[in-house]
C-alpha cells in the first residue's frame, strides 16, 4: 500500500465504497451498501487514511485556549500551502482551468450531500445552523440555483462533460482524498465534530479564492453561465461563513465540549488535503504535464491490489466503462 493520502488505487476504491451511499454504481446491487465484507474492506482503508491524517496534522494544544471560533480562525490563518486560485488568475491557461474543473467535479457535482448526511448526528442550534448552510447549497428551494447545478453549467461553458461522474477515471489520489475525507467524516457519527470543522473551514476561508476563480473564468470569456457558480458562492459565503463561525462551531462545542479537538482535527485535515491537492496540480503544470491520471487505472485492479476477500467485483460493473447515470461521481 502506498501513501494513503495520495495512493490512486486506495482512494479510488474508497470512493466507490462511499458512492454506494449516494447515487450508487451501475450494475452493483444496492444491498452491497451494507455488505459486511465490503464494510470491513472499507474500514481497513479508512484506518490507513485516518492514521496518515493524524500523522500529518499533529496535536492541537496550541489551539486549545479561547473560544472555538477564534481557535478555528487561527488554524485557518496558519495554513501555508500554495495558492491555486492565484496561479489560475495570474497565469492559468484554458486547458489548466478545464483540468481544475475536472478535478473539482467529483466534489462540486454532489456538493452539500456529504455534509447533509450528518445533520441528524447533531443537535440544537448546531443542527439548525448546519441545515441553514446546506439550504443555500441546495439553491434555497430552486433546483436551478443548486450549487451542483451551477457547477455543471460552468463545466458546460468550458466545453466539458457535466454528467455526474464523467471524469472519475481521470482523477488522481490527492483529488479523490478531498472528496473521501468529507464522506468519511459524514458517514461516521464518531466524526460528527470533524465534519463540522470541515464545513466551517470551507465556509470561512473560501470567499477570496472563489472570487479569483470567477475572475479567471471571466478573463477567458466564458460568459455568465461560466462563472455564475463562483459568483453565487461569493455572494452567499459571507453569511454562511458567519453562521459557521458564530453558531455552528460554537453550538457544536457547547453541546459536546469533549469533541473540541475532533472539530479542530476536521479543520486541519481539510487544510492538509487541499494543500496536497493544490501542490499536485501546480507540480504537474510546472513541468508541462497534465495533472490528471493517464488512461489505464481501473477499480477492478484497485480492488485486487487491496485484497478484497469475499467479493467478486468484476460482474457487478465496478470497472472502467460501467455505464449509466449512477456509475461515477
Residue ranges and their predicted role:
Residues 1-329:
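Non-heme di-metal
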Amino acid at each position: 500500500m502506498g501513501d494513503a493520502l495520495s495512493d490512486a488505487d486506495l482512494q479510488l476504491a474508497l470512493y466507490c465504497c462511499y458512492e454506494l451511499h449516494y447515487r450508487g454504481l451501475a450494475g452493483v446491487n444496492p444491498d452491497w451498501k451494507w455488505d459486511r465484507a465490503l464494510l470491513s474492506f472499507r474500514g481497513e482503508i479508512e484506518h490507513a487514511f485516518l492514521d496518515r491524517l493524524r500523522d500529518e496534522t499533529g496535536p492541537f494544544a496550541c489551539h486549545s485556549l479561547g473560544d472555538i471560533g477564534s481557535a478555528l480562525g487561527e488554524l485557518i490563518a496558519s495554513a501555508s500551502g500554495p495558492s491555486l486560485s492565484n496561479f489560475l488568475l495570474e497565469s492559468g491557461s484554458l486547458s489548466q482551468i478545464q483540468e481544475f474543473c475536472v478535478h473539482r467535479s467529483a466534489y462540486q457535482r454532489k456538493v452539500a450531500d456529504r455534509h447533509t448526511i450528518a445533520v441528524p448526528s447533531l443537535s440544537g442550534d448546531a443542527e439548525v445552523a448546519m441545515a441553514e448552510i446546506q439550504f443555500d447549497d441546495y439553491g434555497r428551494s430552486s433546483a436551478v440555483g443548486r450549487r451542483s447545478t451551477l457547477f455543471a453549467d460552468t463545466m458546460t461553458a468550458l466545453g466539458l462533460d457535466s454528467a455526474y461522474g464523467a471524469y472519475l477515471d481521470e482523477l488522481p489520489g490527492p483529488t479523490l482524498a478531498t472528496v473521501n475525507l468529507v464522506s468519511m467524516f459524514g458517514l461516521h457519527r464518531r466524526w460528527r465534530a470533524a465534519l463540522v470543522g470541515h464545513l466551517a473551514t470551507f465556509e470561512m476561508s473560501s470567499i477570496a479564492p472563489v472570487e479569483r476563480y470567477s475572475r479567471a473564468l471571466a478573463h477567458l470569456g466564458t460568459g455568465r453561465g461560466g462563472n455564475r457558480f463562483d459568483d453565487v458562492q461569493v455572494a452567499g459565503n459571507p453569511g454562511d461563513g458567519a453562521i459557521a463561525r458564530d453558531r455552528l462551531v460554537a453550538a457544536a462545542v457547547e453541546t459536546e465540549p469533549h469533541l473540541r479537538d475532533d472539530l479542530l482535527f476536521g479543520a486541519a485535515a481539510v487544510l492538509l488535503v487541499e494543500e496536497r491537492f493544490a501542490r499536485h496540480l501546480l507540480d504537474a503544470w510546472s513541468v508541462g504535464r497534465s495533472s490528471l491520471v493517464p488512461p489505464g487505472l481501473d477499480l477492478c485492479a484497485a480492488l485486487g491490489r487491496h485484497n478484497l476477500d469475499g467479493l467478486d467485483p468484476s460482474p457487478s460493473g465496478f470497472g472502467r466503462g460501467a455505464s449509466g447515470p449512477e456509475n461515477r461521481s
